[in-house]
């Protein structure tokens, strides 16, 4: 086999392959031999069918498999020899093997761009210190205290006010007819917490326990359910009870009941530790992004189209999932697929640039990712999505997604590796506005 490489672009290669007659005939012979071992034909013992009969009987299957097997062998040899890793699907352009004839075909694929990494050792970067003040801890304790409050019916007969919890029935009507899906019984509404529409809360705040009333409610133009957006309906409400919160004392008993802490002091320490850990991670991630953005401005390279397309698809899919959670579809954005692509393209290109840079840094830093680490990431994905781990892993393997997942883990490790070599200065948080 001989081949000639053509660089179509800095990130795309085309390989013209020529296969001599001897190799063609050997590939066909090997495929026929494989068929002979398993084929069953009347009048012949298994494995004893003459090669010529097997070839004539199963010519289409044999020649197709022989071609595919030979091309796959060549692809492995070529990419190994060139020391490249194809990013995209390898496109094949050629016919099928013919006995006694030379075989020619071409393959094309995208590869990572080649560029020189800037010197990142000692790179100056600032990271904000993680700070937690007592007021924030007090606010957390106050929320815990409030959530554990006892709800007690108010002594007097009065409408609910901010801070109260009202137990009520409600139903929406349009032109005197009930609106399906907009009703509830014994619904608990915390007033003053923006849990419902302002018009609805204002109506509820006029109704004492044991009474009912109705009034117009206008849904906002951006309401999640487009069927009600901007619409005015009649809401009928019956209040069963108005309750106030009886707050527990802030003491060791509250800490024990809230989370099994031995004291309120231990509970406060845990809150501080949790805040510190999350903020340290956040500030580190912010500093890493700042460092990466600056390093990316120091290099220039072409972006593989297939890689950008993959991230465009991912971003649009993320958008679709987010919209569905809000009860809406992508079509509610009023944009064509082309307009959506144009909208997310800059972000997709930036993600691709970052990934390419970090994978190059990962090679320089000899970053490795084990199969156990990949499985661990898949386990987390399976738990978050409620899917079976083996089913999810099989899907990732069959669709080639496992390589993208591994690359993402390599990129994350590479970012940590180059950040560890940076000159990081810890700075005080900016004063609150």
Swiss-Prot record:
Q: Which family does it belong to?
A: Belongs to the FKBP-type PPIase family. Tig subfamily.
Q: Which InterPro entries match?
A: PPIase_dom_sf, Trig_fac, Trigger_fac_C, Trigger_fac_C_sf, Trigger_fac_ribosome-bd_bac, Trigger_fac_ribosome-bd_sf, Trigger_fact/SurA_dom_sf
Domain remark in the UniProt entry: Consists of 3 domains; the N-terminus binds the ribosome, the middle domain has PPIase activity, while the C-terminus has intrinsic chaperone activity on its own.
State if Cytoplasm is listed as a keyword: yes
**Signal peptide start-end:** none
Molecular function GO labels = peptidyl-prolyl cis-trans isomerase activity; protein folding chaperone; ribosome binding
User: What is the predominant subcellular site recorded for this chain?
Assistant: cytoplasm
Q: Which gene encodes it?
A: tig
Quote the cellular component terms of the Gene Ontology held in the record.
cytoplasm
GO annotation terms (biological process): 'de novo' cotranslational protein folding; cell division; chaperone-mediated protein folding; protein transport; protein unfolding
Enzyme Commission numbers on file: 5.2.1.8
Q: Which domain of life is it from?
A: Bacteria
Source species, please?
Nitratidesulfovibrio vulgaris (strain ATCC 29579 / DSM 644 / CCUG 34227 / NCIMB 8303 / VKM B-1760 / Hildenborough)
Reaction catalysed by this enzyme: [protein]-peptidylproline (omega=180) = [protein]-peptidylproline (omega=0)
Query: What protein name does the entry list?
Result: Trigger factor
**Keyword set for this entry?**
Cell cycle, Cell division, Chaperone, Cytoplasm, Isomerase, Rotamase
């Amino acid at each position: 086999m001989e081949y000639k490489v053509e660089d179509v672009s800095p990130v795309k290669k085309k390989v013209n392959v020529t296969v001599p007659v001897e190799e063609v005939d050997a590939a066909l012979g090997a495929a026929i031999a494989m068929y002979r071992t398993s084929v069953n034909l009347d009048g012949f013992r298994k494995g004893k069918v003459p090669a010529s009969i097997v070839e004539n009987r199963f010519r289409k299957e044999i020649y197709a498999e022989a071609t595919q097997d030979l091309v796959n062998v060549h692809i492995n040899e070529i990419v190994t020899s060139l020391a490249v890793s194809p990013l995209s699907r390898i496109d094949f352009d050629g016919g099928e093997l013919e006995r006694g004839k030379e075989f020619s075909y071409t393959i094309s694929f995208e590869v990572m761009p080649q560029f020189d990494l800037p010197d990142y050792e000692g790179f100056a970067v600032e990271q904000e210190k993680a700070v937690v003040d007592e007021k924030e801890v007090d606010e957390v304790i106050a929320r815990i205290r409030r959530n554990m409050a006892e709800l007690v019916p108010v002594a007097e007969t009065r409408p609910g006010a901010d801070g109260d919890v009202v137990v009520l029935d409600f139903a929406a009507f349009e032109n005197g007819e009930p609106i399906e899906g907009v009703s509830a019984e014994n619904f608990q509404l915390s007033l003053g917490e923006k849990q419902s529409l302002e018009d609805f809360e204002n109506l509820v705040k006029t109704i004492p326990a044991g009474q009912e009333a109705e009034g117009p409610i206008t849904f906002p133009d951006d309401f999640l359910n487009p069927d009600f957006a901007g619409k005015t309906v009649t809401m009928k409400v019956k209040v069963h009870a108005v309750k106030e919160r009886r707050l527990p004392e802030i003491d060791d008993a509250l800490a024990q009941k809230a989370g099994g802490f031995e004291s309120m002091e231990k509970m406060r320490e845990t809150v501080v530790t949790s805040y510190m850990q999350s903020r340290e991670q956040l500030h580190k991630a912010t500093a890493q992004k700042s460092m990466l953005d600056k390093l990316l401005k120091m290099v220039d390279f072409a972006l593989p189209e297939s890689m950008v397309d993959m991230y465009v698809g991912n971003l649009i899919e993320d958008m679709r999932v987010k919209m569905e959670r809000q009860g809406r579809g992508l079509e509610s954005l009023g944009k064509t697929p082309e307009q959506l692509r144009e909208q997310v393209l800059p972000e997709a290109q930036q993600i691709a640039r970052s990934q390419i840079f970090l994978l190059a840094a990962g090679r320089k830093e000899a970053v490795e990712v084990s199969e156990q680490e990949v499985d661990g990431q898949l386990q987390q994905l399976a738990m978050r999505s409620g899917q079976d781990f083996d089913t999810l892993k099989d899907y990732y393997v069959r669709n080639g997604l496992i390589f993208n997942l591994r690359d993402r883990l390599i990129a994350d490790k590479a970012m940590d590796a180059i950040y560890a070599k940076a000159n990081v200065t810890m700075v005080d948080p900016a004063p609150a506005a």
